[in-house]
Structures are given as C-alpha cells and as structure tokens.
Amino acid sequence: MRCLAARVNYKTLIIICALFTLVTVLLWNKCSSDKAIQFPRRSSSGFRVDGFEKRAAASESNNYMNHVAKQQSEEAFPQEQQKAPPVVGGFNSNVGSKVLGLKYEEIDCLINDEHTIKGRREGNEVFLPFTWVEKYFDVYGKVVQYDGYDRFEFSHSYSKVYAQRAPYHPDGVFMSFEGYNVEVRDRVKCISGVEGVPLSTQWGPQGYFYPIQIAQYGLSHYSKNLTEKPPHIEVYETAEDRDKNKPNDWTVPKGCFMANVADKSRFTNVKQFIAPETSEGVSLQLGNTKDFIISFDLKFLTNGSVSVVLETTEKNQLFTIHYVSNAQLIAFKERDIYYGIGPRTSWSTVTRDLVTDLRKGVGLSNTKAVKPTKIMPKKVVRLIAKGKGFLDNITISTTAHMAAFFAASDWLVRNQDEKGGWPIMVTRKLGEGFKSLEPGWYSAMAQGQAISTLVRAYLLTKDHIFLNSALRATAPYKFLSEQHGVKAVFMNKHDWYEEYPTTPSSFVLNGFMYSLIGLYDLKETAGEKLGKEARSLYERGMESLKAMLPLYDTGSGTIYDLRHFMLGIAPNLARWDYHTTHINQLQLLSTIDESPVFKEFVKRWKSYLKGSRAKHN
C-alpha cells in the first residue's frame, strides 16, 4: 500500500477508495435482499395461531367471552374469564409467506369427508385454525400479552375447582359461596324494597321469588361475612346529645319541620320530620365517595319517601333513588329510580346497596335480563325525607352482609307453607319428554339450601323460629313427586331427592347433593332427638349417591341428570361449570364422610378438566 501511495497522486487514491467503498455497499445490499427475512419462533402450548388464525382469534374473542358468560345458573358459580386483547399484524397467507419468507403454505383440509377448510402446512406439520378447533373440540383459548409479547393460552375447560379450606361445618362458609354475587346477575330484576331479597326473571320476565336464589343470596353474604374484613361504617345521624358538637348538616326548608324527640319504645332519641310531598323535603348532606351501602331506621306516620341523591359516572349527572311507602316493585324515569318499601308504619331498618339499586334501575327492561350498563355512583350526595315520620341511625358502610343474610332468613320463615315447603310459583319445563311443573312445585335443592340458611341463622341467634322452620322443611323429602313431594326412587331401590320433581323422574345430580348438605346441617345442629328424621333422610340419600355416582361419569366429563336412562334419549352432558360444581360438592362431602368413593371421583373428575379420558378397550 505504501508503494502504491508513493507512485499515485493522493487525489487519485481518494477516488479509488471511494469507488471501492461504493462497490462494496452495492454488493452488500444485493446479498441482503437475496436472503429471506427470518422471524424468531416462539413456542406455544396448544395449536399455533399464524396469519389468518390470529385475525380469526381476535375477531372471535368477543364470541368466546359471550359463550363463557352464558354458563351462568342458579346452581353453578359462573367463572370470570380474562378477555384477550386484540391481536394485530395479521397478513394474507400467500403474500405474507412470500414477503416474510415464512416456511408454510396453504393447504385444503377435508373434515370427515364432509367439508373443507383452509389450513397451514409447514413441512410434515399441518396447522388448523383455532376458530375451527375451538368449536369442533369444545375447547378454549385466547391471545394474551405479557411484557409486550403475544402468547396463545389454551385450556380444555373454562371453570375452576375451589380448594376445600377445612372440614365442613354447618356454621362455616358454605362451599365457595363467598364468590357468589347473586344480586348482580342479569336474571335478577332487582332487590325487592319490601322483602329485601332478589326477584328472579330466569323463567319469566314478570319476576318471581325463587327460593333457591334467595337462599343463595343469604348463604353468599353469610360466607362473605366470614371471609372479608369488617366493613368501614360512617355514622351520619343518631339524634343523640353527643351529636350536638357535630355540625348540623340538615336543611329544613320553609314549611317543613325537624326536631330531636324521645322515642319511649326504643329508649333513645330519634329525628322527627314533617315535610309535605310538594316541598323540597328535609335533607341531610352526606358527601361519601368511598362506600355505597346506606342504612337507616325508619317509621312513617303517613305516606312518604326517603330519597338518596347520587353523583354518577354518567357525565357526573345526578340520579335520585326514591324509597317510597308503597308496594311498587321498581320504576325508572329519566334520572329518577323508584323502589316501593311498603308502609313502614312501625320501626324497621332499611338497608340498600346503592350500586345495585342504581344499575338495576337504569338497566330496567321488559325482558328476562337486565340491560347491561356501565353507570356507577361516584358520590352519595344527600338524603331527602318527605311525609311525616321518624329517622334514626343513618349510616353508610362498605358492606352489610349480615343484613342481607337475615333478609333471606326472615323471608324463608315468612314464606314457608303449611307443608314445610317453599312453593315455586312459575311453570318449569325441564325438557322434551318431561311433563311441565306447574306453579306450586317444590324443589329438593331449594329445601336443602333453605335449611342450610336457616340453620346458620339459628346458630347465630339461638332463635328457635329458624330451627323449627328448618325442621319442618324435611317434610317434602318424604313424599313422592306425584304426592307433591320431592322424592324419587331409582330402580325401586335408591331414594333420591329431586331438584325438579318431574314425571318421569330426572335425577339431577347437583341439586340432589345440595339437598343432602342441607340435611347434614340440620342433623348436626338439631341434636339426636329433633334431628332424627333429618339423619334418616340423609343416610338413605348418601347410600343412593355412593351407589349411583358411576352413572354420571362419561369418561371425559359428567352428566347433569339421567334423562338418557329415563327417556331413552341422548345424555344431557354437564357444562364445565356444573362439572366443577359436582367436584366442589364431592370435596365437601368427602370431609364429612370417610368413604373413599368421594375422593376417587374427585381425583378422576378433576383430571377431566385437563383433558384426561378414561381408557378404551
């Protein structure tokens, strides 16, 4: 190079170097363009989603979520699913594979000699679109993002088995009911202002009181009370002398009256109010932005109302919920929601969940389901009272689980008929081949869950009105379905307690096990003498369950009932949420009965959730 530099002018040398660099760059670019662009391949469990599969998975994600949401029922707890984020970056298979150099090609896939779908071939591997796999094999999957990367998650089932915390006791948590939220179900029209319990629209838009739903409402709040921390409670009014140092937040317009007066029946002071219906009413500023369970003691002397003004997430608009002294169920007009709470001419406590009352009012419809709404309260602004009456103990709290539990317990006591049952006043058609159940039928599941509720109320209060009601509830267990009871006999040998006392018998599994749990609660609580009948019914039922469990095992899942045996039709396979309910129930029973059969079935049925199958011949 030094020899060349000595003989060549430096300007010529610069030109030669520049030409050499240009040639090098051109050759480099040409070589790079001839190479295929390779993308790093990420491993995934399950079926790969490439190209059009990704677009299909994204477009089907909403359908997937809607399908899972439909798995709700009064018997099985619906599982919440994480919604997959949308997937971007899909491309045409032919163009995409050429541009990006992917090693797959499109291939026709003939399905069962019936129809053809488009798949992907990569060497000896063939990939089918997951939208087809999902429907064909009844499996589930979604694309999720972790740290900015997409990952496809595949699952054989969508429902979850809850671990049994400890041996079951009649005064403890009821199964996994602390996870139930009965009042938010779209088939709950509202929480009745008069009764304080949910009104169901599951089988009719007119609404009716469904004992199973009411018992579940009580048991869920009882269980939440045991598993959640104590609520925060803000006291706004007690009418006592110690409140004199607090600022007077009551506004009393002209023509209205309010004063502290002594109530001899309560041995305390209360707030007396007089406010004509045509007036603005007397009002108490609240201003709570954290909690939305309001409670107050109330006694009306005339017709009246107590209204709560809410600031909402709906463009900060104000909505008012009116609790009125009439029997109207619920009404909604513009930004006013009305709940009838009855005359209330004697002292009673009104406890309302303002979130539920707001959303049920705004979502009010004439169909079976409440319309979905995103509206939420942001602030409890003030309380307004009209008419003539008395108020006391105005509070706002995080939760009021025991108020809900006792509302359900008291309803069960008040509405039990002379035969010991809770008649269901709506027609129920279980399926083709079964006679319709006309209004007034009993359900063993309702009897069992009601007993479990009443036993807990008795254990808390020692009030025998609850225990006596639970004892009377065993009567329908003793009578056959055609005798207006809930009993069926399988193969003239095994006693069974019917969730739906149909003709012919249906032998629904989960409802039967709930009826047994109720009998167990009662026999353990009532003692040797009073619990004798419950013990006998329980023992006969457990013998039947142990003998008949194999009839509900398909080798890959479970069966909801025995209609295939009774009617000679196709079996009614249990959805995954019912399957996990079966497992949860058996887990509970395995803690109170040492028979190994329950643990064996739990182990096998759990494996079905992961895709295991029984061996073939």
From Swiss-Prot:
Catalytic activity reported: [heparosan-N-sulfate](n) = [heparan-N-sulfate](n)
Subcellular localization: Golgi apparatus membrane
Site (Critical for catalysis): 180, 187, 560, 578
GO molecular function, one term: protein homodimerization activity
Disulphide-bonded residues: none
Alphabetized UniProt keyword annotations: Calcium, Glycoprotein, Golgi apparatus, Isomerase, Membrane, Metal-binding, Signal-anchor, Transmembrane, Transmembrane helix
GO BP, sorted A to Z: heparan sulfate proteoglycan biosynthetic process; heparin proteoglycan biosynthetic process; negative regulation of cell projection organization; positive regulation of cell population proliferation; positive regulation of SMAD protein signal transduction
Topological region Lumenal: 29-617
Subunit structure: Homodimer. Interacts with HS2ST1.
Function, in words: Converts D-glucuronic acid residues adjacent to N-sulfate sugar residues to L-iduronic acid residues, both in maturing heparan sulfate (HS) and heparin chains. This is important for further modifications that determine the specificity of interactions between these glycosaminoglycans and proteins.
Name of the protein in question: D-glucuronyl C5-epimerase
Organism: Homo sapiens (Human)
Gene assigned in the entry: GLCE
